[in-house]
Amino acid sequence: MLSEQGLLSDCGNNYFQMTSCILSGSIQTTPQVSAGGSEAKPLIFTFVPTVRRLPTHTQLADTSKFLVKIPEESSDKSPETVNRSKSNDYLTLNAGSQQERDQAKLTCPSEVSGTILQEREFEANKLQGMQQSDLFKAEYVLIVDSEGEDEAASRKVEQGPPGGIGTAAVRPKSLAISSSLVSDVVRPKTQGTDLKTSSHPEMLHGMAPQQKHGQLTSSPTTSEQLACKPPAFSFVSPTNPNTPPDPVNLEGASVLEEFHTRRLDVGGAVVEESATYFQTTAHSTPFSASKGTSSTLLFPHSTQLSGSNLPSSTAADPKPGLTSEVLKKTTLTSHVLSHGESPRTSSSPPSSSASLKSNSASYIPVRIVTHSLSPSPKPFTSSFHGSSSTICSQMSSSGNLSKSGVKSPVPSRLALLTAILKSNPSHQRPFSPASCPTFSLNSPASSTLTLDQKEKQTPPTPKKSLSSCSLRAGSPDQGELQVSELTQQSFHLPVFTKSTPLSQAPSLSPTKQASSSLASMNVERTPSPTLKSNTMLSLLQTSTSSSVGLPPVPPSSSLSSLKSKQDGDLRGPENPRNIHTYPSTLASSALSSLSPPINQRATFSSSEKCFHPSPALSSLINRSKRASSQLSGQELNPSALPSLPVSSADFASLPNLRSSSLPHANLPTLVPQLSPSALHPHCGSGTLPSRLGKSESTTPNHRSPVSTPSLPISLTRTEELISPCALSMSTGPENKKSKQYKTKSSYKAFAAIPTNTLLLEQKALDEPAKTESVSKDNTLEPPVELYFPAQLRQQTEELCATIDKVLQDSLSMHSSDSPSRSPKTLLGSDTVKTPTTLPRAAGRETKYANLSSPSSTVSESQLTKPGVIRPVPVKSRILLKKEEEVYEPNPFSKYLEDNSDLFSEQDVTVPPKPVSLHPLYQTKLYPPAKSLLHPQTLSHADCLAPGPFSHLSFSLSDEQENSHTLLSHNACNKLSHPMVAIPEHEALDSKEQ
C-alpha cells in the first residue's frame, strides 16, 4: 500500500506524498475513515496534509516499517519502495525487485508503472489490511516539467492509476517514483511517516530540489525520501546532497512560496516543486543532470537517514528508509503537529518527487491542486477538501483547471471537468478541475496520487481525494493539515476521490477540465468503493479543486506554479504565487491536520485566508461552485454564508465551498466546519498567494470554528473540514452559479428535462436542507467538470428554450392573427374554431402538424430551436398557404368585397387582385380559380412552390368550390399559418418568405 501510495505521492506531490501516506494509512486504518469504505475496509485516512518544501526524495514509509521492509507489503514497500522508486528513477534495476517489493510501482516509473499500479492495488489491499495508522499522507504530487507540464499532467491523468506511472510514462522515473514516493508516503507508516513528515516538510522541501535534480528518478527518490524520511534526510537525500539541508529542507522554502522557499532552500528543486519554485529549484539544482544523481544523492541521504532501512536497496533504497526515519524525525521535530506535519512532509516529498520529476522531465511545477474531480457520482464527504484542492491543482496544472479546470474539472472540470469537465473536462474535470477541472497538470499528479490511493484504497478515486487533500493542505501548517486530513478523508471517503478533478479533478466524470479528466481517469481506475465515499467529497473536492485547486497543496502549488507558468494564462500569475504560498500553508495544514482537528481548523483558517486572494482561485472557485452545484445535495450553501462571514477574506465562493463541504461532513458538524471552511478557502485561492501569512492569521479563526465540527466529523470529518474549506471556495462560485441557475430556472423550466434535472440539483445545493441528500445524489451526478458541460448544455438549452418561447410567442401572435383572420374569413365558425384551437393548443409546431404534413411540423420544431425556424416555416407556410387559400378568399373577399360578383367569379376578380398583390402568382391563381379541384391541386403545387399568394389563389378557388375538404384544410392551414388571413397578412407572408 505504501509503495502504492508512495507512487501516488511521488506523482502527485511531495506534499501530497505525505498526504498519500496518510491516505494509505487511512486505507489501512479502515476504522478511522469509514466514509470511503474501501472494498475490504473503508479507507480510513487521517489526512494530515503536510505542506512543506517537496523533498527531493519523498519517502513513504510506514511509521512502523519505514523502509525497513522491502517486501511488497504495504508498509515495507512504502519506505523502501518510495526510496527505491525514486532511486529507481535513476536506478530502475532497484525497481526490479525492490521496487516491486517496496513500491513495485515506484521503482520502475515507466516499466514498473503498470506494476506499481498493480502492486499499488495489491498494496492497497494489503495496506488496508495493514492499516498501519490512521494517518496517511495523501499527498498528491503532480510533477510536470515546465515545458511538458501539461503533457506530463495529461499522461499522468492517463496513467493516473499508477499515480506516478502516468508521469512515469512521460517521465517514467520521475512520475513513477513520484507516485511511489507519494504512495510510500501515504502508505508509510502514515503516522510515523507523517510525524516525520511534519518535521520533514522543510527537509522535504530541500529534498524536493534535490528530487528535481534527480529529475524523474531523483524526484521520486527525493520525494520518497522527504516523505519517508522527511527530516534532514529528505533535504539531504534530495537531489542536492549539497543541501543536506536537513535544516534547509526542513525549512524548505517555507511553503511553496514558503514551500518554494523551503524547497529552494533545500535544493532549489524543492521550490520548483511548487510550480514556479519547482522550476526554479529544478533549474537551480541541476535537475535533469542530477536526475540519477538526485536519486542517488537522495539515496545517500536516504541511506544516511534510513540506510538501515534499505541499505541493500541501494542508495535509493536506503534513502527511502532514511527518509522515512528522517521524515518521522522531522515530522515530529519540525512540526509540533507531527501528525499534520508528517502528512505535510509526506505531501512535501511527493511534491519534491514531483519537482524532481519536473526537473528531469521538466516537471518543475509539481502543483497539486485539489481538484474536486467529483468524478464519482458517489457522495463524497466534502471533507476531502484537500482532494478537491488537488484536483483543482491538477486542473490548474493541466490547464484543465483553467477552466479550472475540473473539472473541472472540475473539472470538470470541465473538460477536467468535461472529462475532467468530465474528467474535466477533468475534469478533470475536469475537473474539472476539477479541475478539474480542472486542471491537467495537477490532474496527472492527482491521477497518480489517486491511482495510488485508489489501488491502496481500492475505493475509486482515492488518489483524487489524496490529491485534493494535498492541495487543500496549501497552508504550510494548516494547508498541509488540511491536505493531509483531506487526503485521509478522501481515502476515508473513497467516494470523494471519485468525486473529484477537477477540479479537479475531478472531477472525474465531468470534473474539472483537464484536472477532471485526469481525476476522472483516476477515479475510474479507482474502484467504485472509493467513488462512493469520495463522490460527494469529489464534488466538494471539485469545488475545492476549483477554489483550492490552484494552490491547494504545496505539491499542488508546485504544479500550480508550473502550471501557472504554462497555464499562467489560465490561472494567471496568481496561481503560481498562490502555489508558492500554498505549500507553506499546506505544510501547516498538514501539521495541524495531523495534530488534531483543531490544528486542522487552524490550517483551514490559514488556508482559507491564503486561498482567498488568488484570482486563479476565483476561477477555481467558480469551478468549485459548479462542483458544489454538483454537490448541491450538500446543505452547505446556508452554512457557506455563515462561513463566508467567517472568512471575510475568503471569497463568497469560499463560503460556498464551505457549504459544500459542510454537507459532506454532517450538516450539524459541517456547519461548524463551515466557518473553518470559510477560513479554509484560503487553501484554494489565498493559500497560494499568501498562504503562510494568511494561514497564520486565519488559523486562529479557523481553528475555533473547525475544531468543533472537525472533531464530530471524526478523522474523515476532519478531512472533511478541510474539504469544506476547499469546498467553501468552490461553493461560493457554486452559490453564485446556483443563483444564476435559479435565475435561469425560469428558462430551465422550458428547457429539456436534463436541464430541469440540473436545475433541481442546483436548487438542492442552494437549499441546505436538501443539500445533504442532494450531495449524495451529487456523488452520482457528474463532477464539476460535468457540471461545466452541463452548464453549457443548460445554457444552450435555456437559450433554445428562450428562442422557442419567443417563437411560440410569435406563433401565438400568429395564431391570434389566424383566428382573427378566421373570423374575417368567410369560412364557417367551425373553420375559425379549428384554427383557433389548433394553433393555441399546439403552437406553431402543432399548427404545422395539423397541416397535412407532420414531418414538416417535426422539422419545423427542430428548426425552431436553431432559429432556422423561418426556413422551415417558409415551407410550412407554403403548404399552409395552399390550404389556407381555400378560406383565405374571405379575407380577400373583404378586400374584394366591393366585387362580390368577382368573388363569385373568382376567375375574373381574384386574378386581378392577386395580380395586383402578387403578379408572379397571378398565373397560379388563375388555375385554382378556374377549377376548384384543379386549383386545389395547383394550389398545392403552388404552395410547394413558395408563393405567399399561392394560398390566395387557392383560397379563391376553394371558396368558389366551397369544398368542405378544402375549407377544413384551410382551417387547419390557417391554424398553422397565421399568414392565411388578410392581404396584409399576405404581405407579411411575402415579406417573411
Swiss-Prot record:
GO terms under biological process: negative regulation of cardiac muscle hypertrophy; negative regulation of cardiac muscle hypertrophy in response to stress; negative regulation of transcription by RNA polymerase II; positive regulation of transcription by RNA polymerase II; transcription by RNA polymerase II
Region (Interaction with LMNA): 1-51
Subcellular location(s) per record: Nucleus; Nucleus envelope; Nucleus, PML body; Cytoplasm, Cytosol
GO cellular component terms listed in the entry, alphabetical order: cytosol; nuclear envelope; nuclear lumen; nucleus; PML body; sarcolemma
Membrane topology recorded in Swiss-Prot or TrEMBL: Peripheral membrane protein
Sequence positions bearing Phosphoserine: 146, 818
Biased composition, class Polar residues, residue ranges: 80-90, 212-225, 300-315, 500-532, 695-711, 849-864
Alphabetic keyword roster: Cell membrane, Cytoplasm, Disease variant, Membrane, Nucleus, Phosphoprotein
Region annotation Required for interaction with ISL1: where it falls in the sequence: 161-837
Basic and acidic residues composition-biased segments: 564-574
A GO MF label: transcription corepressor activity
Main location: nucleus
Functional note: Required for myoblast differentiation into myotubes, possibly acting as a transcriptional regulator of the myogenic program. Required for cardiac adaptation to stress through integrated regulation of the AKT/mTOR pathways and FOXO1. Regulates cardiac homeostasis and plays a role in the protection against cardiac hypertrophy. Binds chromatin. May act as a transcriptional cofactor for ISL1, repressing its transcriptional activity. May also repress MYOCD transcriptional activity.
Disease tied to this protein: Myopathy with myalgia, increased serum creatine kinase, and with or without episodic rhabdomyolysis 1: An autosomal recessive muscular disorder characterized by mild muscle weakness, early fatigue after mild to moderate physical exertion, exercise-induced muscle pain, variable susceptibility to episodes of rhabdomyolysis, and elevated serum creatine kinase levels. Rarely, affected individuals may demonstrate cardiac involvement, including left ventricular dysfunction or rhythm abnormalities.
Miscellaneous comment text of the record: It is uncertain whether Met-1 or Met-18 is the initiator.
Protein name: Muscular LMNA-interacting protein
Species name: Homo sapiens (Human)
